[in-house]
Amino acid sequence: MCVIIIKQKNNVMSEEIAKTSSKINPHGLGIIWLDTFEVEYHKSKDYRKLLTKRPFIAHFRYATKGKVNKANTHPFICGNNKDEYLMHNGTIKGMGTDECCDSKELACHLGSINRIDWKKELEQYDSRFVSINVRTRSFQIYNRNLYTYRDGIWYSKANVLQDNLIAVYGTLKKGFGNYYS
């Protein structure tokens, strides 16, 4: 079920939290650096990239729909607008296929509607979202009440903050492994 981590301050996140995020969400890591608004895609095991004072929004993926590959690693471009990106934590019923994850399908849909209507569209789901505009260097958190804020960092799921966490959501689909493994 993924996790989105938003770190805006000059602090460094805990290595244990980054490692736990990677361990329970092993299917890809996407990062938008908030000082440059550059977008990067990595393997989840590259979590040490986040042990920095640089501000970022990161997404660790746990595949529930769609293949485990770079194409299904967040953030996703919203339709044809190369400036707008979406990160999502949750599952959207009725979206996604064996090939394409639900979040990517939703991002494509958002690109086809007026930006002013995104809030209404996203708040209808019991999920967590962040939209990022790399041109205006801004971002918006949706359903913020579902996030946990600790030590200057927002977490879309509090399970990564638990000590000695050993369980993951459900079981992996046959043939699913770590992104790029």
Locations of regions flagged by a protein language model:
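Extreme N-terminus nucleophile/cap motif
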Residues: 1-49, 53-56, 146-154, 159-162
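Conserved beta-strand-loop-short alpha-helix elements that form
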Residues: 2, 83-96
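Short beta-strand scaffold segments in enzyme catalytic cores
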Residues: 2-6, 28-35, 74-77, 127-140
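Regulatory input/activation interfaces that engage signals or partners
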Residues: 59, 64
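Acidic loop->beta-strand submotif enriched in PP2C/PPM serine/threonine phosphatases
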Residues: 65-85, 121
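Cytochrome P450 core scaffold surrounding the K-helix E-X-X-R motif
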Residues: 66-68, 95-97, 175-180
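Short histidine
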Residues: 93-149
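Glycine-aromatic micro-motifs
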Residues: 161-181
